[in-house]
Regions:
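Conserved, well-structured functional cores that handle cations and Mg-NTP chemistry
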Residues: 1-131, 136-139, 305
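Alpha-helix initiation and N-capping motif
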Residues: 6, 35, 47, 51, ...
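Short coil/turn segments at secondary-structure boundaries
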Residues: 8-11, 53-56, 179-183, 262-268, ...
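Structural signal for hydrophobic packing residues in well-ordered secondary-structure cores
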Residues: 13-17, 46, 58, 62, ...
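A short, flexible helix-boundary coil/loop motif
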Residues: 16, 265-334
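Nuclease catalytic cores that cleave nucleic-acid phosphodiester bonds
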Residues: 100-188
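An anionic, glycine-rich sequence signature occurring as long contiguous blocks
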Residues: 150-253
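A C-terminal functional module that forms or caps the active site or interfaces directly
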Residues: 215-297
């Protein structure tokens, strides 16, 4: 967090060197460990233990009913000609922007098998789990329901019969439902989102095959470029256990925060795709450090009321001055 990048073990070593100076005052009686030492540590360190320890230290409180978004991201730099790039599946709390758990797979297709195991390791009781269409699987919905949570999951071509039935219904009768419409203006565009939720699914032949299924939804996203007037429009479909339209819309909207608030920042701020760490637990442990750092930076900006401050600028300030770094690491320290 006290430097521009956090791509590999050498960057962690440089951070340690910086923190050994100034008011942070870390003591290394035998000298600062070299990058190979950090590499060996991260290769054997249990990622879940590291994650639980760091998030527990931060002490973030979750809302009683949170949106827990599941999504995967491929660390492109971790692959080579002999070994595919690692794919990290994350459970991300949209409201507090903390990570509940991660799992690494060697291929994106393995995400389907990894998600149920990941859900069994975390507490999601009372929460709303959201996911993209890859996770639209009967086993995953059953796991979510068994864990005491609700869900809103995207529906696409990997469930062709179900998708066809839902599209056909909305095409024929969608106008009979009262929609919820939202409008957002920013980044040079106007974005309208229209949400529909249908809970009378007695017509749906597959309804008994999906645990907890209580409704199907549709979201239409219409984007207008303010400068050119160019418009784009796209429809997305969902299966859900929710019965409230506002809650459904809020859950879908917050799921996109995984891309906007997490994955994009990991790539742009910490250049995660440039990381070459690929052995044993190193990729996931470095991924944990990046996510915790992002959360610390975000929470500091929010608490200080500095909405216009960029994370890059704050990281630069931490690198220049150890007092700034301490303020981010320990915001309640007087």
């Amino acid at each position: 967090m006290s430097g521009k990048d956090l791509r590999g073990h050498g960057d962690v070593r440089n951070c340690a060197a910086g923190m050994a100076q100034g008011k942070v005052g870390l003591k290394f009686s035998n000298g600062i460990p070299d990058s190979d030492t950090f590499r060996r540590i991260f290769e054997i360190l249990d990622p879940k233990e590291l994650s639980d320890c760091l998030w527990g230290w931060l002490g973030y409180e979750r809302e009683a009913r949170s949106v827990v978004a599941i999504d995967g991201k491929t660390e492109r730099g971790s692959g080579n000609g002999k070994h595919p790039a690692y794919h990290v599946v994350t459970t991300f709390v949209a409201e507090s922007q903390i990570t509940l758990g991660d799992v690494v797979t060697e291929e994106k297709s393995n995400e389907i098998k990894a998600v149920p195991e990941l859900l069994k390791l975390i507490d999601i009781k009372g929460d709303i789990v959201t996911a993209d269409a890859m996770s639209c699987q009967k086993e995953i919905m059953e796991t979510i329901t068994d864990r005491g949570a609700d869900y809103a999951v995207a529906l696409k071509g990997n469930q062709p019969a179900l998708e066809a039935d839902v599209k056909e219904w909305f095409g024929a009768f969608g106008d009979t439902l009262a929609p919820l419409v939202t409008k957002d203006i920013g980044h040079g565009r106007i974005e309208y989102r229209t949400y529909w939720l249908l809970n009378d699914i007695s017509w749906l032949g597959q309804k008994g095959e999906w645990a907890g299924l209580k409704g199907v939804g549709k979201v239409r996203c219409r984007i207008i470029d303010k400068k050119t007037g160019f418009e784009t429009e796209a429809d997305r479909y969902f299966i859900t256990s929710l019965t409230d339209l506002d809650e459904f819309a809020d859950s879908v909207r917050k799921h996109w925060s995984v891309e906007n608030q997490l994955h994009w920042r990991l790539d742009v701020i910490f250049r995660e795709d440039a990381s070459k760490a690929k052995k044993d637990n190193s990729p996931l442990n470095l991924n944990v450090l990046r996510k915790v750092s992002l959360s610390l930076l975000k929470q500091f900006i929010v608490k200080q009321g500095k909405k216009r401050m960029s994370m890059n600028k704050l990281m630069f300030m931490c690198a220049l001055n150890s007092e700034n770094l301490l303020s981010v690491l320990f915001p309640d320290l007087k």
